[in-house]
Design a protein with these regions (language model features):
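Short, solvent-exposed alpha-helical "recognition" segments
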Residues: 28-35
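Basic Lys/Arg-rich amphipathic helical interaction modules
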Residues: 1-16, 21, 40-42, 46-82
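Base-recognition residues in the alpha-helical recognition helix of bacterial helix-turn-helix
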Residues: 24
């Protein structure tokens, strides 16, 4: 699992989406919510973007994509290991 954080321009490039479409997909539950990096900056785990893109390439249904997004966001909670 990659620990790289992608900023919005990178996510737009990786997904082939415009800025407004990225945020629309988040609202629709088709893309994970960004994580805060600072007071005015956010990013997305690269592994999540890769998983979503792989599902899109595999032509998963909208319902399957929404379930994947829910699973990815739920998995964030268990990501801290010391």
């Amino acid at each position: 699992m990659s620990k790289t954080i992608l900023r919005l321009p990178q996510v737009m490039t990786e997904c082939g989406l415009a800025r407004s479409t990225v945020y629309l997909r988040i609202k629709q539950g088709l893309l994970t919510k960004p994580i805060p990096l600072g007071p005015r900056s956010v990013g997305w785990p690269q592994s999540e973007i890769e998983a979503i893109n792989a599902a899109r390439i595999a032509e998963r249904s909208e319902m399957e994509l929404k379930q994947l997004v829910k699973t990815l966001q739920a998995n964030r909670q268990g990501g801290i290991r010391v």
